[in-house]
């Protein structure tokens, strides 16, 4: 505010702009609360800065700050590439986040009433905010119905294609390797949880391995020298009594541990190398081919001219303590940690989300599907996965109780702010295991790019919904 008042003293011919700005800012705190006033102040000062430049010397370049640095009125990220987030911007983001309202209560009518009781005028800004909130609400629901929701017919056809692939693999594996200790394979993923968005294009084929309880045990990643929560080692036990070869899966053991990479290689030789997919595809009227390269074993199934389904083949271990481990490597350290199995929280996270929605008829699942669609349709946000988005909602649910359908716009904005905060901190805890950092497989540059994109969207959230 001082910056505004100081500039005002030296400008007598600004046609009352300074007076108007001073009046708006002096009353903003009463009407909008501390957070709203801070954001209004930043925006107003930026506008006034441009206005002052236009009045001063339009033909001359803007003078640089004597210190060689831009002032906070000119954020260092203005005009920079959207793919680069420098240190100055991080500081701006951190400072701005601290001034953002922490809850929607800052914008509720009672805040306006308190302002009126202190002598403030009925705020046009409050009415405009309500209109904007209503507009965002309408856009979110329109986006949900028009872009997010998948027609039931498309989902049904995709599920049938996935089931056909599952049946072929089951028959082949039982015929080729009848002694391989496997439980019944099954299909899983968002296609079967009604959480898939935009197109029905992905499914997971879970392949549960049977391990002898007295021969194998899991060691949490945080208890190893690697110290990676969310992953586990599966160690071979009792080798002195049951030597190598006593378990079918000893052939996939590396350094005394069951290697998910070796397990995947066994299945890859069978699924990608031994099965005659062109012949099977001609019978099923599909075009089937293995995806190469891929971090997991994936099949691409073209079941219609313009529709493709990707089926991930995921070996699964269900340990004695109930922990589910899948053969999906660490994204950034697959070579260094090739013996690590990934702990899967998807089933428990989805169940928790649905239980919360059932308790209060909430819109958490709707929020999740909208965010998933936004990330799927915006390449700059593609690195945010379903687990991160689900946990952002679960974490916010611990602080915010109103998840009614009418609060969709407010919760959506809170989620954007929460995601920016997690990215700025470089950490998002998993609600089912607080030791797990769900951002640990993102590079610093990716975190910066995601944070930049979401931070820019805070001032224009509808831009996230304007996709091709």
Swiss-Prot record:
Mark out the compositionally biased spans (Polar residues).
Answer: 91-108
Q: Where is this region: Dimerization?
A: 50-196
Keywords of this protein's UniProt record, alphabetized? Membrane, Mitochondrion, Mitochondrion outer membrane, Nucleotide-binding, Phosphoprotein, Transmembrane, Transmembrane helix
Q: Where's it found, cell-wise?
A: Mitochondrion outer membrane
Q: Name one GO cellular component term.
A: mitochondrial outer membrane
* Topological domains, Mitochondrial intermembrane: 1-29
**Annotated region described as Disordered, given as residue ranges:** 56-123
Gene Ontology biological-process annotations: mitochondrion organization; positive regulation of mitochondrial fission; positive regulation of mitochondrial fusion; positive regulation of protein targeting to membrane
- Taxonomic superkingdom: Eukaryota
Annotated GO MF terms: nucleotide binding
Instruction: Show which residues sit on the Cytoplasmic side of the membrane.
Output: 48-468
Q: What is its main location?
A: mitochondrion
Q: Which InterPro entries is this protein grouped with?
A: Mab-21_HhH/H2TH-like, MAB21L/cGLR, MID49/MID51, MID51-like_C
State the membrane topology.
Single-pass membrane protein
Residues covered by region (Important for interaction with DNM1L): 161-170, 235-244
Q: Where does ADP bind?
A: 188, 190, 202, 344, 346, 372
Q: Which residues cross the membrane?
A: 30-47
What does the subunit comment say?
Answer: Homodimer.
Name the protein family: Belongs to the MID49/MID51 family.
Describe the task this protein carries out. Mitochondrial outer membrane protein which regulates mitochondrial fission/fusion dynamics. Promotes the recruitment and association of the fission mediator dynamin-related protein 1 (DNM1L) to the mitochondrial surface independently of the mitochondrial fission FIS1 and MFF proteins. Regulates DNM1L GTPase activity and DNM1L oligomerization.
Question: What name does UniProt use for this protein?
Answer: Mitochondrial dynamics protein MID51
Source organism? Danio rerio
